């Protein structure tokens, strides 16, 4: 276990990932607990659910939110393990992964929030009017997405700091961290030949 580094837990970025993991777990757990109380997804299904109204199982958007939050919780645990074992991927790889998860989280939040606010029974009675757990789940999904945005900013800054470039992109000025010229930067930084003299 020589590669294990417990001091990484002091890093703001590591702690932010831990918060994201907690938020995503809370989001899918809250939605899983919403077994009734949802006034929808349509009038016919609502009648079939009975007087206690429907659970999250009747909503494809809510099930999508659960799936995305579970995936992100697992993803964040893997990332934290990589940090602890000093097996952190290059910033461009990490940024790409965060971008994909960011899109999925925002889509899950937006779709669920839309489903939560539509009206089936009457214009003043939205689907989630009495569904406290569903509303909490959607809120925590939003907080997770927002926290991931900050992780993307941290990772982008690291990308620039190490002068990383996209393989095959060439040394163009518009690529973050890469300047024009004949020399190309790499990650991790390589020792110059003069250091061996």
From Swiss-Prot:
Listed transmembrane segments: 14-34, 64-84, 100-120, 136-156
Location of the protein in the cell: Cell membrane
Biased composition (Low complexity): 180-197
Residue numbers spanned by region Disordered: 178-197
Keyword flag Zinc: no
Topological relation to the membrane, as annotated: Multi-pass membrane protein
Cytoplasmic-side positions: 1-13, 85-99, 157-197
InterPro entries (alphabetical): Marvel (IPR008253)
Stretches in topological domain Extracellular: 35-63, 121-135
A GO CC annotation given for this chain: plasma membrane
The keyword Transmembrane helix belongs to this UniProt entry's keyword annotation: yes
Keywords annotated in UniProt: Cell membrane, Membrane, Transmembrane, Transmembrane helix
Assembly behavior: Homodimer and heterodimers.
Family membership: Belongs to the Casparian strip membrane proteins (CASP) family.
Protein name: CASP-like protein 0U1
Organism, as annotated: Micromonas commoda (strain RCC299 / NOUM17 / CCMP2709) (Picoplanktonic green alga)
């Amino acid at each position: 276990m020589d590669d294990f580094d417990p001091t990484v837990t002091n890093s703001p970025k590591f702690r932010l990932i831990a918060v994201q993991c907690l938020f995503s777990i809370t989001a899918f757990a809250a939605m899983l607990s919403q077994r009734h109380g949802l006034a929808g997804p349509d009038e016919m299904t609502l009648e079939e659910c009975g007087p206690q109204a429907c659970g999250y199982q009747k909503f494809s958007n809510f099930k999508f939110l659960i799936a995305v939050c579970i995936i992100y919780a697992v993803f964040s645990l893997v990332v934290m393990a990589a940090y602890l074992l000093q097996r952190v991927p290059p910033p461009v790889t990490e940024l790409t992964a965060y971008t994909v998860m960011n899109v999925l989280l925002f889509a899950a939040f937006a779709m669920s929030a839309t489903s939560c606010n539509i009206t089936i029974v009457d214009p003043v009675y939205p689907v989630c009017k009495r569904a406290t757990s569903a509303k909490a789940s959607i809120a925590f999904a939003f907080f997770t997405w927002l926290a991931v945005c900050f992780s993307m900013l941290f990772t982008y800054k690291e990308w620039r700091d190490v002068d990383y470039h996209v393989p095959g992109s060439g040394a163009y000025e518009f690529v973050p961290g890469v300047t024009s010229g004949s020399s190309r930067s790499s990650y991790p930084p390589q020792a110059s030949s003069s250091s061996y003299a």
